[in-house]
A protein has these predicted regions:
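Acidic interaction surfaces
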Residues: 1-142
Length: 142
């Protein structure tokens, strides 16, 4: 797991710039073809702010690390209600604005570890069967 400096939201508040800098190794520099998700919060959105960041999902070793980074990004809120406002390069069936649970996160990681041909085959499998289980796909793909 990458070393992170996570601070309590009750400690001195960081500026938004400092919050992004504190998780900068996870932030996408240029959006092209890497799997990523834009993480904001409902509070900021409801206050008229789209503050957040595109997070490169390839950078995370675990769901816990992902959630820690999302919370660090929004450390100015005591208990941030995360809002995933956009996504790219993973199946739409797994995207949800309001949450990403560990099961979905693990599916996305397994998907992005596939080579391009296997990803295309998986998408065709899901389209044909409606089954987005990677283990079922792999049983049929081999």
């Amino acid at each position: 797991m990458k070393e992170m400096n996570l601070s309590s939201p009750n400690k001195a508040r960081k500026s938004l710039r400092e919050q992004v800098e504190s998780v900068s190794i996870y932030v996408v520099d240029n959006l092209w073809d890497q799997p990523a998700i834009y993480c904001g919060t409902y509070k900021k959105y409801n206050e008229g702010s789209l503050f957040g960041a595109w997070l490169d999902l390839r950078m995370f070793d675990s769901y816990e690390e992902f959630m820690d980074v999302c919370k660090q990004l929004h450390a100015d809120e005591e208990d941030p209600e995360l809002m995933f406002q956009d996504y790219q390069c993973f199946p739409a069936e797994w995207y949800s604005e309001s949450c990403m649970d560990e099961e979905v996160f693990d599916k996305i990681i397994a998907f992005i570890q596939m080579d391009d041909d296997k990803q295309k085959a998986f998408k065709a499998y899901v389209s044909a069967t409606g089954d987005d289980s990677i283990s079922d796909f792999e049983d049929n793909y081999e």
